[in-house]
């Protein structure tokens, strides 16, 4: 089982905004873990005037996704509808299976079982989580386009005791904690 530690270092955040940011970050990450079937034991969020920190322990290192059947359009639907389904699911026409149901004959596709590394999933989820924090007032600073509650200076991220590499706007993660 693995651990994940995220620390966002910024200029001073007022106490009420810290509470809201903690709550929002925790909710977003918990929902994302649930959507992606990522198991964990405990997820805690802390804050101080200059830091917002998330710690998750006993994370699965891989997520196993089972094969499943996905229902598509009805057999006899316009070709345009069928092509849209094929494109959306990134399959070819030969992958389609016709099956009879209570409501008629439909096209289905069968997905393959696969494993996703938790590290790869975190690289997608965490930037979205940071971006999604709702601030009552956001500010832009320097020549960056990032709008955030206070100027964000650094992102520390470690998964399973290794640096978790991702980029959020102009910032790249690092594995050094800033002490001031």
Predicted segment positions?
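Long, basic N-terminal domains or extensions that often function
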Residues: 1-180
């Amino acid at each position: 089982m693995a651990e994940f530690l995220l620390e966002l270092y910024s200029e001073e955040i007022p106490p009420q905004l810290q509470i809201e940011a903690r709550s929002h970050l925790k909710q977003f990450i918990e929902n994302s873990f649930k959507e992606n079937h990522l198991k964990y034991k405990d997820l805690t969020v802390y804050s101080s005037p200059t830091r917002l920190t998330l710690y998750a322990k006993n994370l699965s290192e891989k997520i196993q996704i089972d094969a499943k059947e996905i229902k598509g359009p009805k057999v006899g639907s316009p070709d345009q509808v069928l092509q849209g389904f094929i494109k959306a699911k990134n399959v070819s026409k030969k992958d389609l299976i016709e099956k009879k149901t209570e409501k008629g004959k439909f096209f289905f596709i069968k997905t393959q079982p696969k494993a996703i590394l938790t590290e790869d999933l975190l690289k997608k989820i965490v930037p979205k989580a940071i971006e999604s924090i709702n601030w009552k007032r956001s500010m832009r600073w320097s020549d960056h386009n990032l709008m955030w509650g206070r100027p964000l200076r650094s992102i520390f991220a470690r998964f399973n005791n290794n640096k978790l590499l991702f980029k959020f706007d102009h910032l790249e993660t690092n594995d050094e904690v800033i002490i001031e």
